[in-house]
Amino acid sequence: MANNFTTPLATSHGNNCDLYAHHSTARVLMPLHYSLVFIIGLVGNLLALVVIVQNRKKINSTTLYSMNLVISDILFTTALPTRIAYYALGFDWRIGDALCRVTALVFYINTYAGVNFMTCLSIDRFFAVVHPLRYNKIKRIEYAKGVCLSVWILVFAQTLPLLLTPMSKEEGDKTTCMEYPNFEGTASLPWILLGACLLGYVLPITVILLCYSQICCKLFRTAKQNPLTEKSGVNKKALNTIILIIVVFILCFTPYHVAIIQHMIKMLCSPGALECGARHSFQISLHFTVCLMNFNCCMDPFIYFFACKGYKRKVMKMLKRQVSVSISSAVRSAPEENSREMTESQMMIHSKASNGR
């Protein structure tokens, strides 16, 4: 089984470099991880979308960016069942290259649409807190709609070429899908991926850190000028939310992009084939860091829950209503059940009495 996966690059050098030697472990852990992501991500984001839609009359720029982020996460979860099956089968894609390409498209759309909308949210909050007078123009819903449309167009323009690129590859008796070794022969691959990391990670995280650092400075200045603000705990809650957003972003997106950047630099510094051990380590790191990055779609609803008072109140109200309906249904069904049992008992007694006569 270990020899089922050998890449052409390794074979040409006479080495049996199995980049999927970890498949026996991965076929258990990765489906489990993505099943949790699918359930939590789908339920959490659908709940967030329901709350946003119910409050559409009060929608503003922040809510609109959040809604687009939620839609991006829901779109991603729809592609997860096929990936779960792929990993459970030990990196074997059995439903054709066309669906593999569509899955890759959805994956990258979610990744970079999510990053872009998180960046939009940080800029939106920056103007709301640091430059409130300018924010009056930016918070206009028409302006925010234009920004959201631009983000989707940009992301689709960046990712649509994936539909024209073969994503699957025969490896022994299996077919891999959306794996890095499938693209190793692409011309100028290191430069392409380094450019993608620059635009899709380095630039957004720089903007996010700058915006939130300025917001923190403004909150500290406000607290010094007005002690009542500090006592109310509003600033502390805002700072905790900012820290949560930054920590989630760094934990989810940094490992993947750092792994890509360092490996591409190695390839540029050593144009020849890298050692099998280095390539296998990179392949394992990709699987681990991609799992971590995809977990971000589960974290977004929790950020809304703790950050947005209105969202938290709405969710709790919906849950209480659901529990209340369940309890009342159970209470109503209990007398009906007892009544039915009594009727059946009476009928049996009557039947026996009739037979006795």
From Swiss-Prot:
Distribution of this protein across tissues and organs: Expressed in mature B-cells and increases in expression early after activation, before being down-regulated in germinal center B-cells. Expressed in astrocytes. Specifically expressed in CD4(+) dendritic cells but not in CD8(+) dendritic cells. Expressed in monocyte/osteoclasts precursors and mature osteoclasts.
Phosphoserine carried by residues: 324, 345
Listed name of the protein: G-protein coupled receptor 183
CDD domains the record matches: 7tmA_EBI2
Biological processes, Gene Ontology terms: adaptive immune response; cell chemotaxis; dendritic cell chemotaxis; dendritic cell homeostasis; G protein-coupled receptor signaling pathway; humoral immune response; leukocyte chemotaxis; mature B cell differentiation involved in immune response
SUPFAM superfamilies: Family A G protein-coupled receptor-like
Region annotation Disordered: where it falls in the sequence: 336-357
